[in-house]
Amino acid sequence: MSHAVAPFKRRLRDALESDSLPMALGRVLPLLDGRRREAFHGRDFPAEQARLAAIRKRDVADGPRLLQQFTAVAEKAGMVVHPPADADAVRETVAELLRQASARMVVKSKSMATEEIGLRQALEADGLEVVETDLGEFLVQIADELPSHIVAPALHITRERAAELIGSVTGQDLPPDPDTLVRAAREYLRDKFIAADAGITGANALVASTGSVMLVSNEGNARLCSSLPSLHIVVAGVDKLVATMTDAAATLDMLPASATGQTMSSYVSFISGPSRSADIEMSLSLGVHGPRDVHVVLLDNGREAMRRDPMFQTALQCVRCGACSNVCPTYQQVGGHAMGHIYTGPIGLLLTSFHHGMENVAGPQSLCAGCGACATVCPAGIP
């Protein structure tokens, strides 16, 4: 299934001629980078960067073994792990799981892997109601647009437009006040969480030694998507495989500070199987207060080819923090819709060629100034 991505020249022209985009970028990007600088104040960033880079490099190189280990441990714990596949196969696997569950309504947390393969659009075409529950993704869904930033998908949307978008689905005349808009979105989405037949999330890490899925979020929506419905489907790239909890913790040491300037995100969850209880005579029952069924659907879609490419394998070290976009002088002028395809900003220039083809990266690649600002802030040491 193709993504509804406009031609590069049109996206670039729209960005340069936009009246609202400079306002949105000017409000948010300096704030994000300022928070990142403050979060790392007093820390030895080069040393921490080198440590995470070494861990990510080792785990990427050891990917095939980690895949076998994760699959064995996760399935022993009661999850079903689907082997790595391309975009078409992953979409069909998820659709079939939802058909088998007779699901009609799905809640979804923010996931670049699902954006990469156009999963929501495919499921909607299959007749399902799919609701993005991350506030930024919710705004982008209402606007019928694509995310413009890896961490802040609605970064290009001003608060004034956000009020119009949320009001269009809630039927309210809302002021451009962030707190008011968040409350309105919360009230609207709460019923969706309760009614959902299935929840779809991504993963920030897949821990091979424990068979665990790590989820990191601030809004709490990922936890609701993964715990309220009876079916939880995880869609994750094989690049998310890490060897141990120690390796996952190394990502946690750097990801929140690099992405949002936090010491730690509000919610960190490790999911190691379906909800269970043995409180009645030690007889195991699944599906207590959380899902009865947990499926991990793994995505390759060019990742193994990237892992084997000595020039590009370091791109798999990416932890999806978006810091490179925040300091990129070109991104600061034109945003992610022009400087990117599905994956935006500097890292998107590397990933797009493998995930979506060289034809979709040629235009955005021409915007790179070659200044190297991205490398100075990358927590995983991608040059």
Predicted regions and their residues:
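The feature marks the mature, well-folded catalytic cores of soluble enzymes
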Residues: 1-310
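A glycine-rich phosphate-binding loop feature that marks nucleotide/adenosyl-phosphate handling sites
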Residues: 89, 266-275, 320, 331-335, ...
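Ferredoxin-type iron-sulfur electron-transfer modules in oxidoreductases and energy-metabolism complexes
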Residues: 286-315, 330-383
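Short, cationic low-complexity segments
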Residues: 313-326
